[in-house]
UniProtKB/Swiss-Prot annotation:
Enzyme Commission number, as recorded: 4.1.3.4
Residues bound to substrate: R56
Entry GO MF terms: hydroxymethylglutaryl-CoA lyase activity; metal ion binding
Described purpose of this protein according to its UniProt entry: Non-mitochondrial 3-hydroxy-3-methylglutaryl-CoA lyase that catalyzes a cation-dependent cleavage of (S)-3-hydroxy-3-methylglutaryl-CoA into acetyl-CoA and acetoacetate, a key step in ketogenesis, the products of which support energy production in nonhepatic animal tissues.
The keyword DNA repair is annotated on this UniProt entry: no
Residues annotated as domain Pyruvate carboxyltransferase: 48-315
Pfam families documented for this protein: HMGL-like
GO terms for cellular component: cytosol; endoplasmic reticulum; endoplasmic reticulum membrane; membrane; perinuclear region of cytoplasm
PROSITE patterns reported in the protein's UniProt record: PYR_CT
Keywords: Cytoplasm, Endoplasmic reticulum, Lipid metabolism, Lipoprotein, Lyase, Membrane, Metal-binding, Myristate
Protein name: 3-hydroxy-3-methylglutaryl-CoA lyase, cytoplasmic
Amino acid sequence: MGNLPSAAKHCLNYQQLLREHLWSGESVAGALDPAQEASQLSGLPEYVKIVEVGPRDGLQNEKVIVPTDIKIEFINQLSQTGLSVIEVTSFVSSRWVPQMADHAEVMGGIHQYPGVRYPVLVPNLQGLQHAVAAGATEIAVFGAASESFSKKNINCSIEESMGRFEQVISSARHMNIPVRGYVSCALGCPYEGSIMPQKVTEVSKRLYSMGCYEISLGDTVGVGTPGSMKTMLESVMKEIPPGALAVHCHDTYGQALANILTALQMGINVVDSAVSGLGGCPYAKGASGNVATEDLIYMLNGMGLNTGVDLHKVMEAGDFICKAVNKTTNSKVAQASFKARLE
């Protein structure tokens, strides 16, 4: 073939590249690769915790009910990828979210692997009681920085929701159950448009003061940009340390990874994502899924940031659930990798 141009060599070595450190995040023993050295110099976190929300946030908007055994197998596959947190279901009324009607069966059916946490979403005290009865040992509550979204999503005002959450969090803490808090519409609302950073800060501070160990700031509509992410985080971080914050980005406008990078540069090291980019929001028409876990891991691996997660195994779990629900993956990494395998 003679002397090949550099670009051609890269094409020929594409499969090999995918098998190397961008897949696993591993570097040569005893040495930092250039990406890891750069991450340390730039002040980026050395470790990023990924909170996998695919089984709950990813599937809850699916119109066709996913069989319980499929959900259980999906979660069991994710549990073997190195992920340390997998949000498995939601103890909400089946009238509001039919997809989550089998929450107790899912909770009782999964194999809970050592070192993996399995939080569930609860809307109120009744949901907490049902979750605990089903074996849940960690929960999350779901608030909003938008009055309109709060009323559409949980059928009450922000102030009313805070009253509910205070009861839930207090009760959970008495049972030594950790509580995570979500704040949706942190960068925009489908009904109100732009949301003032101060409003996000107020809601986040209240949840944190009640006892939530971590506040996940959600770009529910996926309209955020690195600029708006930076402005919002600067406001919230005046009241809550970055170590108690996470970001939850939807990719409607293709900004999720850029927004996540901005958050990492500001000291946040917890990121929510969903395998295959599953998700959406029934109360935010047009919003696409969460940032794909595969794409997030690929980016973090390429930056030399440790996640402890096996990209190949995550892709296999994504392939499983996409086939089960008859969907095409939204992960760019999965699309490119599967295509390369066929060539």
